Curated annotation (Swiss-Prot):
Residues 131-340 form the VWFA domain. The gene is Itgb4. Integrin alpha-6/beta-4 is a receptor for laminin. It plays a critical structural role in the hemidesmosome of epithelial cells. Is required for the regulation of keratinocyte polarity and motility. ITGA6:ITGB4 binds to NRG1 (via EGF domain) and this binding is essential for NRG1-ERBB signaling. ITGA6:ITGB4 binds to IGF1 and this binding is essential for IGF1 signaling. ITGA6:ITGB4 binds to IGF2 and this binding is essential for IGF2 signaling. It is a single-pass type I membrane protein; Lipid-anchor. This is Integrin beta-4. One of its GO terms (molecular function) is metal ion binding. It comes from Rattus norvegicus. Disulfide bonds join C30-C48, C38-C456, C41-C61, C51-C72, C245-C288, C458-C477, C469-C480, C482-C491, C493-C521, C504-C519, C513-C524, C526-C537, C544-C558, C552-C563, C565-C574, C576-C599, C583-C597, C591-C602, C604-C616, C628-C673, C634-C653, C637-C650, C682-C708. The fibronectin type-III-like domains bind BPAG1 and plectin and probably also recruit BP230. Residues 981-1086 form the Calx-beta domain.
Length: 1807
C-alpha cells in the first residue's frame, strides 16, 4: 500500500483530481483559454503551464499535470515559479522596552491569481513611552472646560506617571477658519470676539511635547478663550497639522502617540460648502504650515481635510485619537471614531471635570488593541492579516496582551484583473511596489512585492522565418507561428487551397471529416478542442463507456473511442483496479486465506453468514449476538449439574466441557462468557475458541471456581432506619423553632412597624377605545426594612358590579372546556431571539416548555395540550426583570380550576415543572372571570409590577369594574398595607365592528390555501385592530393545516381583510387511519383594540373538503375525454349569477326534469378559451365560485348528470365580481427642478382591482428620524390620467415625506411612501418646466384640496419672478388627452414642454401644429428646433438640448391626418399586471408553475419593430408547469400575426451549454408541449417562436430549473417519490449609471437575488445601440453585494447598450440590459446621462423594452442622475436608486478614472 501511494502516477492522479474539484474547475481554464502564445497561456491562470516540445501533439496550454500526462517531456514544460524570500529578520528581544516586529524585510513575486502566506510577529512591551498631546476647542462655549483643565494639572500628571515612567505632554488649541461664514469679520469682533478673549484663529501649537510638567502648567495658565460664529468647528485642520508637523509638535520615534481631541461641537469637513463664500476651493495639500509661533497659516487658501485623509495620515504617523466630547456632539463622533482602526470615544461632562478619568480609561482600552495595515499597496496586490489566537474588534483591530509576542497570518494575493483589465496590462506601478505592513504603535515590515508578468524565455529566442516553417513563419516555443495566408503545423498549407476535400472523406460518408472537422490541405483538423480524434475525426471522446455516470470511471481518458486507463486500473471502462490492497485482511493476508481477489474484491470459497463479503474474515458481530446464550444451559448442566437442562436433557448437548484453573483473556478467544447460576447465585465463566460454532467433538473450557458474593450484613439495615428517623425528628424541631421566632419578631415594634407591602394606587380609570393591550401593570410597593424576601399572593375578579356573576358563570357547565392563561418566570435570561417567533432559539425553548408543562398538567383530568406559547420580559420585576416570562394557554374543564391552581402553586414552590426550571415566587393563572397569581420582592427591591388581566369582552357593560386584592404573604415577614385596587373600564362608541362574513367556510385541499375574509363595519373612521388564531377540531395543526396567529390592523377607510391559512397535503397514513372523517378547524377573533368591537360571528369554522381536489385533478382528463352518453336529463333552467364579493360569485339554477344525481359547473374568464375553464361538482342546484379575480367578467354554464351520463349545458351566463381596493401605486419618481420645486410622478397600481377614480398625494416635513413635523398637506388628483404633480415653495434643505394612494369604487388603497431632501439631489440644467395638464401646488399654501391649480387645456407662461404660472387665454383645445408639439420659428415662440407618461396638453406656435404622442416616462426636455416636412422625411434635433430620460425604445409612430399626427387609441403601454394575465388565478401561487410574461410590444418610430408584414410577433408569455422531476409542460399564448400561422418551433438546451434540442409543432392550434428526460437541478433555456408564410417571427426566451432531491451517488437520478419545484434564475439588480467625464461612466449593479449557482463573477458587454463598432466585454470577478465597473473610451451623444450577466458555476445567468447616452449641454460644466427615447429617429431594436419598476425579472429602468456619485447614500422610492456625491469624489474621479477605495457615511457628507 505504501508503494502504491508513493507511485508518481498516483501523485499525478491525485493532482488531477484535486485540480478538478477546485471551485470553478480551474483546470479547465487553461485548457479552454484561446491563447496564441506561451506568455498568454501563463497569464490565464496561476496553474497554467506551456509545453515547448516540438513533437507534442496535444494542447500545449494546460495544467502541468495535464501536459505531463499527455506526453510532454518534463524539461519541455515551462512554468513561471513564484518566490518568497525573507531579506531581513532580526529576532524579537522581549527584554527591550520598545515595540518590535519580525521579520523586517521580505521580497515576494507572485503569478496573477496566486496567494502566499507567511507568519508575522509583533511584540508590544508592558510599558512603553507615551506622548500625550491635548488638542482643545477654544470657542467661547468651552471657557469653563479650560478653567477646569488649568486646575487639574496635578491629577493629570499623577495619571501619566501611573501609565508609564517615560512620558511627554503637549497642548494645542483651535477654533475655525477666520473667514465668512465661520467667523464674524467685523473689526471689533476680530479683535475680541468675546469679553476677555483672544482674537479668532484656526489652529495654534501652544506647548510642544515636553517632559517638564511644571512648565506645561505654567504656560497653560496664560491661555484665554476665543470664539467664532457658526456651530461646527475647524478641528479637522488642527488634527491634520498635529499629525504632519512632527518636529513642531515633538512626536518621538519609538513612543505611543496619543491625541486627545476635546470639543462640544460638530466639525467642518472637505466640500461641506462652508468655504464657498470665502472662495476657499483648493484641496488640502496635507503638508505642515506652521509659522514660528506655531500658528496655522494656510487656513485662507486650503479647504478642510476629509475623513479618509485624516484616517490615512494618523495611521501613517502612529497617532491614536481619543475623542472627548460632550453629549451634544456625541452622535457626530460616535460614527466618526469607527473609521479609525484604533481610537477611543468618551463622554465629556459639560465642564470637562472628568477628563482625567476619561484619559485613564481610554489609555487602558487603547493599549489592548492593535491594528495592522498594509500601506502603499499597488492595485495588483491584496493583503489580509488574520490571527488564529487573537480576536478581532468591530473596526478590524486585534485584542492583544502586552508583554507577549503576537503571531499573525499574512495572506498576500495577486489579483488576475481589475475592472476587466488583466493585471499584466496595467501600469508598472500597479504591478509592483514596496508595501509597508505597519502595526499601530511601531514601525513595520517592508515588502518588495511584484506580480510576475515576464514573457516566456522561449519567445525571446524565436527563429525568424525558420526553415522548420518552410520560411513562411517563425519557430517559437516548439511550434510554428505562420505568416498571414499560411497555415498548418509547418506553414505548408496555403489558405487558398482548402477546397479539395476528397482526401478527408471516409468511405461510405458524404461529409468531410465525418462532419466533426475541417479539411485543410488534405488533412482533417478536428473540432471540439480534442473531443474528436482519428484520421477522419470519426472518434468521439465523449462516447466511451461510463461507470456511475463518469467517463472511463474518471480513472482514464477516452482516446480513439476506447478508454486508456491510468496505471493501476483496467477494464473496459477502467472500473477494475489491479491492486489487491482492498483484499488485504486484518492479518495482512489475502482474503483471509479463504478466497481469491478479483477486480479489487474478495470472492470467498464458501458462503456463510459467519464470513464477511470484503475479506472473508469471521464476522464476530454475528457470532456474539447469541453464541454465549446458546451454550449457556449446556455448560451449566455439564459442569455444575444445574440449569434448565440438568438431568437427561443434558445428554443432548453436542459438545463437551473441560474444567480448567485459568481461562484465557477475552482478547485471545472468540468469546468470553459469564453468567449467574440461579441455584446458588454465583457467577461462572467459560470461553469459546475456534470458528465460534462448536461441533460434536469440540470442547468448551470452563473455570473451576465460581465467584460468590460474601454473606450480607443484615444488621446494618435497622441501624440505618434508626438514624433516618432521628434526622427527621431534628428537622421537625428546627422548623418549629423557626416558626416560633418568626411569630415573636412580628410582635416586636422594631421588626414589624413600617415593613409592609401594598398597592401603590387604589383606583384606575381606563377607556377601552384608548387601550392598546388587554392587561394592566399595577405597581406594588414595599416600605420599611427591605432586607429579606417577600412573596405576595393576589387575585382579580371581573364584573364586580354584577353580584354573583362569577359564581353563576362557573355553574353553567362544569365540564365545558375553557381556556386558562398561564404565566411563569423561567430560570434563564431572555434574549432578543426568544421574543421573535419563528427563530430557532424560540422554537427550541417553546418545544421544551410545552413538553414539560404537558407532562405535569396531564394528571389533571380533561386538560388538553398547551398552545399559543410566547415569551416576553416583565419590566419592574426587581432583580429578575431580565429573566424570561412564558405566557401560554391550556384548555381544561371549567371545574378543574382549583386543581390547576394547587398544582401550579406546588410546582412553582418546588422551582421546576418536570425538568423545566422556573423561578419561585411568580405565577399567574387566568380563568374566565378571575385570575390568581404571585409576585416576589427580592432583597433590596422596593417596587414590582403586578400584571393583571382585564377580561375585555364584547358583551361587557358600558362601565364595568374589576377588583384586585392582595391575599397574603406566604413567604417573608411583611404585612399587607393597601390590599385592594378598583379598576373601572369605560366602553365608549366603537370605531368599528369586526367579524367574519359567515360562520362557516368550505375549502378544497387542492387550493393549498384557505382564504377567510374579515369585514369591518365602520362607525368612526379610524384604526381598528383585532387578534386572530386557529384552533383544532377534527383537523389537526401541522397535519392538515399550518396553525397561524397574529393581528389584523384596519387603517382608516379599510373595510375588508383576508386571513390565509396554508393547507397541507393529506398523507397516505392519515387517510388510512382517519378514514373519510370531515376535517374542520376554527378561526377565532379576539382582543379588539383601538376602539374596535367584535361582531357576530367572531368564530368561523373552516371545512376542508377532499372532493374538489379530486375533481380538479381530473379537469384535463374530463376535457380531453369524449363526452359521456347523454341520458334523458334536460338542461338546467333559469341560470342566474350574482356577485357576492370581490372574489366570489353565487351561481344558482332550477333543476331540470328527471332525477339528476348532481351538477357539473364550468366557468372561465370572459375572453379566454372555454378549454381553460374550471370545473366544479355540486349536489345541489347552487354553487359558490370562490378565489376569483376582483372586478373581472366571468362566463359560466351548468349541466346535470345522472346514472346514464351528462345532460345538455344551460345557456351561458356572465357576471362581474365586485371591485376591491387597489394596491399601492407604482414607484415614485422625483424630477428636481430646484431646491424648492420638484415634480412628483407615479405609476398606476399593479393591481387596480377596478376603475381608478382618483389619487391622493400627501406631503409634509420630517425630522432626522423620519418622524413627521406638523400636519401633512393633502392634494386630491381627481383625474386618474394625471399621475404627475408639480410642488412649489418647499422649504429649502428640509426632508419631506411624500405618500400617494389610489382610489377606486371600493375605496382607498395602501400608500406608496418616499422620503427625499431636494438639497441632496442633483439639479437639472434646465428652466422650470411648463407642464400642461399637471396639478401645481404651493407647499406654503393652506390645507386640504383647495390650494392647487389644475391646467387641463391651457398653456402656462411662468415668468421667473412669479410663484405661480399664469394661464394663457388661448382657445385652441385638444380632447382625449392628445398632445400637440409646437414647432417654433422665431425667438418669441413658446417651445418649452414636458412629456409625461400618457399626459398631454397644447402649446402655442405661429406655425401649423402636428399632433404627436410622447411615450417616455417622467422626462423634461428643452427643444429649440424640431422640424418635419412629410411622413417619409426624418425630423432633426440640434445638439443644443438636454435629456434625463429612461429608455422607451418601443416608441409609437405617428399617423398623419389633416396635417397632424396622432396615435391609434387601441395601442397601450406599460407592463403586465396580474390582472392582465387571465386564466391563472392571482391567489393560486402554485409552486410547480411559473409564468414569464413580457411587456406588450409596440413598434418604434421610423421602422416597424415587428419586421415585415405577415411575420408573427413574439409569443406574449411562457408558462412552465412541472409534471415530474425530469419533465415539464411548456405553454405559450398565440402571438399576433396578419397572416395565418403555420406552426411553432420550441428549442431548448442546458444554460451552461450542451446539445440543442428542437421540437417542431405543425399544428398552429397547439400552444403547449411536454418535454421529457430533463436533468434535475439543471437550468434550461427555452425559446419559442411562430411561423407564417412570410417566415419565422421573433422568439420568446425563458430559463427554468426543476429542483428535486437526487440520489447521493447519482446526482442525475432523482429520488423516487421526492418533491419537486420550479425555479427561474434572476438577473443582476438594477443598473445604475454615473457620468465621470464626457467619455467615461461608472456602471454599478446588485447581485441577483436568485442566481443559477454560485457566482464567480460578472460579464459586462458594451456596444453601440445602433451598431457601428465592435462590442467590448469586461470581466468583474467576485461576488460582492454591489459591483461596479468604470467604462472609459465612450463617445458623447451616442447611445450605448450595456448587458450584465452573472458568471456562475452553472454557466451564465440571465442578462440585465440598459441603454444610456452621455449627452452634453453647451456651456454646462458636467455631462449628464440620458436614455434613448421615442423622439429620436434612431431605429432601436424592439426587444429593448423598459419596465418602469425595478421589480421586473426581465428588464429594468435605471434611475439616472447627472453629476458624479459617491456610493454611500441611497434613496429608495419604489425600487429606484439614486446616489449622492461630494466634492471630494468629483475631483478624485476626474484624476483616477473613477477609482475610490474608501466609503464614507452620509452623516459626514450631508448638511
Amino acid at each position: 500500500m505504501a508503494g502504491l501511494c508513493s507511485s508518481p502516477w498516483v501523485k499525478l492522479l491525485l493532482a488531477v483530481v484535486l485540480s478538478a474539484g477546485l471551485p470553478g474547475n480551474m483546470a479547465n481554464r487553461c485548457k479552454k483559454a484561446q491563447v496564441k502564445s506561451c506568455t498568454e497561456c501563463i497569464r490565464v491562470d496561476k496553474s497554467c503551464a506551456y509545453c515547448t516540445d516540438e513533437l507534442f501533439k496535444e494542447r500545449r496550454c494546460n495544467t502541468q499535470a495535464d501536459v505531463l500526462a499527455a506526453g510532454c517531456r518534463g524539461e519541455s514544460v515551462l512554468v513561471m515559479e513564484s518566490s518568497l524570500e525573507i531579506t531581513e529578520n532580526i529576532q524579537i528581544d522581549t527584554s527591550l522596552h520598545r515595540s518590535q516586529v519580525s521579520p523586517q524585510g521580505l521580497q515576494v513575486r507572485l503569478r496573477p491569481g496566486e496567494e502566499r502566506n507567511f507568519v508575522f510577529k509583533v511584540f508590544e512591551p508592558l510599558e512603553s513611552p507615551v506622548d500625550l498631546y491635548i488638542l482643545m476647542d477654544f470657542s467661547n462655549s468651552m471657557s469653563d472646560d479650560l478653567d477646569n483643565l488649568k486646575q487639574m494639572g496635578q491629577n493629570l500628571a499623577k495619571i501619566l506617571r501611573q501609565l508609564t515612567s517615560d512620558y511627554t505632554i503637549g497642548f494645542g488649541k483651535f477654533v475655525d477658519k477666520v473667514s465668512v461664514p465661520q467667523t464674524d469679520m467685523r473689526p471689533e469682533k476680530l479683535k475680541e470676539p468675546w469679553p476677555n478673549s483672544d482674537p479668532p484663529f484656526s489652529f495654534k501649537n501652544v506647548i510642544s511635547l515636553t517632559e517638564n510638567v511644571e512648565e506645561f502648567w505654567d504656560k497653560l495658565q496664560g491661555e484665554r478663550i476665543s470664539g467664532n460664529l457658526d456651530a461646527p468647528e475647524g478641528g479637522f485642520d488642527a488634527i491634520l497639522q498635529t499629525a504632519v508637523c512632527t518636529r513642531d509638535i515633538g512626536w518621538r520615534a519609538d513612543s505611543t502617540h496619543l491625541l486627545v481631541f476635546s470639543t462640544e461641537s460638530a466639525f467642518h469637513y472637505e466640500a461641506d460648502g462652508a468655504n464657498v463664500l470665502a472662495g476657499i476651493m483648493n484641496r488640502n495639500d496635507e503638508k505642515c504650515h506652521l509659522d514660528a509661533t506655531g500658528a496655522y497659516t494656510q487656513y485662507k487658501t486650503q479647504d478642510y481635510p476629509s475623513v479618509p485623509t485624516l484616517v490615512r495620515l494618523l495611521a501613517k504617523h502612529n497617532i491614536i485619537p481619543i475623542f472627548a466630547v460632550t453629549n451634544y456632539s456625541y452622535s457626530y463622533y460616535e460614527k466618526l471614531h469607527k473609521y479609525f482602526p484604533v481610537s477611543s470615544l468618551g463622554v465629556l461632562q459639560e465642564d470637562s471635570s472628568n477628563i482625567v478619568e476619561l484619559l485613564e480609561e481610554a489609555f487602558y482600552r487603547i493599549r489592548s488593541n492593535l491594528d495592522i495595515r498594509a500601506l502603499d499597496s499597488p492595485r495588483g496586490l491584496r493583503t489580509e492579516v488574520t490571527s488564529d489566537t487573537l480576536q478581532k474588534t468591530e473596526t478590524g483591530s486585534f485584542h492583544i496582551k502586552r508583554g507577549e509576542v503576537g503571531t499573525y497570518n499574512v495572506h498576500l494575493r495577486a489579483v488576475e484583473d481589475i475592472d476587466g483589465t488583466h493585471v499584466c496590462q496595467l501600469a508598472k506601478e500597479d504591478q509592483r511596489g514596496n508595501i509597508h505592513l505597519k502595526p499601530s504603535f511601531s514601525d513595520g515590515l517592508r515588502m518588495d512585492a511584484s506580480v510576475i508578468c515576464d514573457m516566456c524565455a522561449c519567445e525571446l529566442q524565436k527563429e525568424v522565418q525558420s526553415a522548420r516553417c518552410h520560411y513562411r513563419g517563425d519557430f517559437m516555443c516548439g511550434h510554428c507561428v505562420c505568416n498571414e495566408g499560411w497555415s498548418g503545423k509547418t506553414c505548408n498549407c496555403s489558405t487558398g487551397s482548402l477546397s479539395d476535400t476528397q482526401p478527408c472523406l471516409r468511405e461510405g460518408e458524404d461529409k468531410p471529416c465525418s462532419g466533426h472537422g475541417e479539411c485543410q490541405c488534405g488533412r482533417c483538423v478536428c473540432y471540439g478542442e480534442g473531443r474528436y480524434e482519428g484520421h477522419f475525426c470519426e472518434y468521439d471522446n465523449f462516447q466511451c463507456p461510463r461507470t456511475s455516470g463518469f467517463l472511463c470511471n474518471d480513472r482514464g481518458r477516452c482516446s480513439m473511442g476506447e478508454c486508456v486507463c491510468e496505471p493501476g486500473w483496467t477494464g473496459r471502462s477502467c472500473d477494475c483496479p489491479l491492486s489487491n490492497a482492498t483484499c488485504i485482511d486484518s492479518n495482512g493476508g489475502i482474503c483471509n486465506g479463504l478466497g481469491f481477489c478479483e477486480c479489487g474484491r474478495c470472492h470467498c470459497n464458501q458462503r456463510s453468514s459467519l464470513y464477511t463479503d470484503t475479506t472473508c474474515e469471521i464476522n464476530y458481530s454475528a457470532i456474539r449476538l447469541g453464541l454465549c446464550e446458546d451454550l449457556r444451559s449446556c455448560v451449566q448442566c455439564q459442569a455444575w449439574g444445574t440449569g434448565e437442562k440438568k438431568g437427561r436433557t443434558c445428554e443432548e448437548c453436542n459438545f463437551k466441557v473441560k474444567m480448567v484453573d485459568e481461562l484465557k483473556k477475552a482478547e485471545e478467544v472468540v468469546e468470553y462468557c459469564s453468567f449467574r447460576d440461579e441455584d446458588d447465585d454465583c457467577t461462572y465463566s467459560y470461553t469459546v475458541e475456534g470458528d465460534g460454532s462448536p461441533g460434536p467433538n469440540s470442547t468448551v473450557l470452563v473455570h473451576k471456581k465460581k465467584d460468590c458474593l460474601p454473606a450480607p450484613s443484615w444488621w446494618l439495615i435497622p441501624l440505618l432506619i434508626f438514624l433516618l428517623l432521628l434526622l427527621v425528628l431534628l428537622l421537625l424541631l428546627c422548623w418549629k423553632y423557626c416558626a416560633c421566632c418568626k411569630a415573636c419578631l412580628g410582635l416586636l415594634p422594631c421588626c414589624n412597624q413600617g415593613h409592609m407591602v401594598g398597592f401603590k394606587e387604589d383606583h384606575y380609570m381606563l377607556r377601552e377605545n384608548l387601550m392598546a393591550s388587554d392587561h394592566l401593570d399595577t405597581p406594588m410597593l414595599r416600605s420599611g426594612n427591605l432586607k429579606g424576601r417577600d412573596t405576595v399572593r393576589w387575585k382579580i375578579t371581573n364584573n364586580v358590579q354584577r353580584p354573583g356573576f362569577a359564581t353563576h358563570a362557573a355553574s353553567i357547565s362544569p365540564t365545558e372546556l375553557v381556556p386558562y392563561g398561564l404565566s411563569l418566570r423561567l430560570g434563564r435570561l431572555c434574549t432578543e431571539n426568544l421574543m421573535k417567533p419563528g427563530t430557532r432559539e424560540c422554537d427550541q425553548l417553546r418545544q421544551e416548555v410545552e413538553e414539560n408543562l404537558n407532562e405535569v398538567y396531564r394528571q389533571v383530568n380533561g386538560v388538553h395540550k398547551l398552545q399559543q406559547t410566547k415569551f416576553r420580559q416583565q419590566p419592574n420585576a426587581g432583580k429578575k426583570q431580565d429573566h424570561t416570562i412564558v405566557d401560554t394557554v391550556l384548555l381544561a374543564p371549567r371545574s378543574a380550576k382549583q386543581s390547576l391552581l394547587k398544582l401550579t402553586e406546588k410546582q412553582v414552590e418546588q422551582g421546576s415543572f418536570h425538568e423545566l426550571k422556573v423561578a419561585p415566587g411568580y405565577y399567574t393563572l387566568t380563568a374566565e372571570q378571575d385570575a390568581r397569581g404571585m409576585v416576589e420582592f427580592q432583597e433590596g427591591v422596593e417596587l414590582v409590577d403586578v400584571r393583571v388581566p382585564l377580561f375585555i369582552r364584547p358583551e361587557d357593560d358600558d362601565e364595568k369594574q374589576l377588583l384586585v386584592e392582595a391575599i397574603d404573604v406566604p413567604v417573608g415577614t411583611a404585612t399587607l398595607g393597601r390590599r385592594l385596587v378598583n379598576i373601572t373600564i369605560i366602553k365608549e362608541q366603537a370605531s368599528g365592528i369586526v367579524s367574519f362574513e359567515q360562520p362557516e367556510y368550505s375549502v378544497s385541499r387542492g387550493d393549498q390555501v384557505a382564504r377567510i375574509p374579515v369585514i369591518r363595519h365602520i362607525l368612526d373612521n379610524g384604526k381598528s385592530q383585532v387578534s386572530y388564531s386557529t384552533q383544532d377540531n377534527t383537523a389537526h395543526g401541522h397535519r392538515d393545516y399550518v396553525p397561524v396567529e397574529g393581528e389584523l390592523l384596519f387603517y382608516p377607510g379599510e373595510t375588508w381583510k383576508e386571513l390565509q391559512v396554508k393547507l397541507l397535503e393529506l398523507q397516505e397514513v392519515d387517510s388510512l387511519l382517519r378514514g373519510r372523517q370531515v376535517r374542520r378547524f376554527q378561526v377565532q377573533l379576539s382582543n379588539p383594540k383601538f376602539g374596535a368591537r367584535l361582531g357576530q360571528p367572531n368564530t368561523a369554522t373552516v371545512i376542508i373538503g377532499e372532493q374538489d381536489e379530486t375533481d380538479r385533478s381530473l379537469i384535463n382528463e374530463i376535457s380531453a375525454s369524449p363526452p359521456l352518453p347523454r341520458g334523458d336529463l334536460g338542461a338546467p333552467q333559469n341560470p342566474n349569477a350574482k356577485a357576492a364579493g370581490s372574489r366570489k360569485i353565487h351561481f344558482n339554477w332550477l333543476p331540470p326534469p328527471g332525477k339528476p344525481m348532481g351538477y357539473r359547473v364550468k366557468y372561465w374568464v370572459q375572453g379566454d378559451s372555454e378549454s381553460e375553464a374550471h370545473l366544479l361538482d355540486s349536489k345541489v342546484p347552487s354553487v359558490e365560485l370562490t378565489n376569483l379575480y376582483p372586478y373581472c367578467d366571468y362566463e359560466m354554464k351548468v349541466c346535470a348528470y345522472g346514472a346514464h351520463g351528462e345532460g345538455p349545458y344551460s345557456s351561458l351566463v356572465s357576471c362581474r365580481t365586485h371591485q376591491e381596493v387597489p394596491s399601492e401605486p407604482g414607484r415614485l419618481a422625483f424630477n428636481v427642478v430646484s431646491s424648492t420645486v420638484t415634480q412628483l410622478s407615479w405609476a398606476e397600481p399593479a393591481e387596480t382591482n377596478g376603475e381608478i377614480t382618483a389619487y391622493e398625494v400627501c406631503y409634509g416635513l420630517v425630522n432626522e428620524d423620519n418622524r413627521p413635523i406638523g400636519p401633512m398637506k393633502k392634494v386630491l388628483v381627481d383625474n386618474p390620467k394625471n399621475r404627475m404633480l408639480l410642488i412649489e415653495n418647499l422649504r429649502e434643505s428640509q426632508p419631506y415625506r411624500y405618500t400617494v394612494k389610489a382610489r377606486n369604487g371600493a375605496g382607498w388603497g395602501p400608500e406608496r411612501e418616499a422620503i427625499i431632501n431636494l438639497a441632496t439631489q442633483p439639479k437639472r440644467p434646465m428652466s422650470i418646466p411648463i407642464i400642461p395638464d399637471i396639478p401645481i401646488v404651493d407647499a406654503q399654501g393652506g390645507e386640504d384640496y383647495e390650494n392647487f391649480l389644475m391646467y387641463s387645456d391651457d398653456v402656462l407662461r411662468s415668468p421667473a419672478s412669479s410663484q405661480r404660472p399664469s394661464v394663457s387665454d388661448d382657445t385652441e383645445h385638444l380632447v382625449n388627452g392628445r398632445m400637440d408639439f409646437a414647432y417654433p420659428g422665431s425667438a418669441n415662440s413658446l417651445h418649452r414642454m414636458t412629456a409625461a407618461n400618457v399626459a398631454y396638453g397644447t402649446h402655442l406656435s405661429p406655425h401649423q401644429t402636428h399632433r404627436m404622442l410622447s411615450t417616455s416616462s417622467t422626462l423634461t426636455r428643452d427643444y429649440h428646433s424640431l422640424t418635419r416636412t412629410d411622413h417619409s422625411q426624418s425630423g432633426t434635433l440640434p445638439r443644443d438640448y438636454s435629456t434625463l430620460t429612461s429608455l422607451s425604445s418601443q416608441g409609437l409612430p405617428p399617423i398623419w391626418e389633416d396635417g397632424r399626427s396622432r396615435l391609434p387609441l387601441s395601442w397601450t403601454l406599460g407592463s403586465w399586471s396580474r390582472a392582465q394575465m387571465k386564466g391563472v388565478p392571482a391567489s393560486r401561487g402554485s409552486p410547480d408553475s411559473i409564468i414569464l410574461a413580457g411587456q406588450s410590444a409596440a413598434p418604434s418610430w421610423g421602422t416597424d419593430s415587428r419586421g415585415a408584414m405577415g411575420v408573427p410577433d413574439t409569443p406574449t408569455r411562457l408558462v412552465f408547469s412541472a409534471l415530474g422531476p425530469t419533465s415539464l409542460k411548456v405553454s405559450w399564448q398565440e402571438p399576433q400575426c396578419d397572416r395565418a400561422l403555420l406552426g411553432y418551433s420550441v428549442e431548448y438546451q442546458l444554460l451552461n451549454g450542451g446539445e440543442m434540442h428542437r421540437l417542431n409543432i405543425p399544428n398552429p392550434g397547439q400552444t403547449s408541449v411536454v418535454v421529457e428526460d430533463l436533468l434535475p437541478n439543471h437550468s434550461y433555456v427555452f425559446r419559442v417562436r411562430a411561423q407564417s408564410q412570410e417566415g419565422w417571427g421573433r422568439e420568446r426566451e425563458g430559463v427554468i430549473t426543476i429542483e428535486s432531491q437526487v440520489h447521493p451517488q447519482s446526482p442525475l437520478c432523482p429520488l423516487p417519490g421526492s418533491a419537486f419545484t420550479l425555479s427561474t434564475p434572476s438577473a443582476p439588480g438594477p443598473l445604475v449609471f454615473t457620468a465621470l467625464s464626457p467619455d467615461s461612466l461608472q456602471l454599478s449593479w446588485e447581485r441577483p437575488r436568485r442566481p443559477n449557482g454560485d457566482i464567480l463573477g460578472y460579464l459586462v458587454t458594451c456596444e453601440m445601440a445602433q451598431g457601428g463598432g465592435p462590442a467590448r466585454t469586461f470581466r468583474v470577478d467576485g461576488d460582492n453585494p454591489e459591483s461596479r465597473l468604470t467604462v472609459p473610451g465612450l463617445s458623447e451623444n451616442v447611445p450605448y447598450k450595456f448587458k450584465v450577466q452573472a458568471r456562475t458555476t452553472e454557466g451564465f445567468g440571465p442578462e440585465r440590459e440598459g441603454i444610456i447616452t452621455i449627452e452634453s449641454q453647451d456651456g454646462g460644466p458636467f455631462p449628464q446621462l440620458g436614455s434613448h427615447s421615442g423622439l429620436f429617429q434612431n431605429p432601436l431594436q424592439s426587444e429593448y423594452s423598459t419596465v418602469t419598476s425595478t421589480h421586473s425579472t426581465t428588464t429594468t429602468e435605471p434611475f439616472l442622475i447627472d453629476g458624479l456619485t459617491l456610493g454611500t447614500q441611497r434613496l429608495e422610492a419604489g425600487g429606484s436608486l439614486t446616489r449622492h456625491v461630494t466634492q471630494e469624489f468629483v475631483s478624485r474621479t476626474l484624476t483616477t478614472s473613477g477609482s475610490l477605495s474608501t466609503h464614507m457615511d452620509q452623516q459626514f457628507f450631508q448638511t
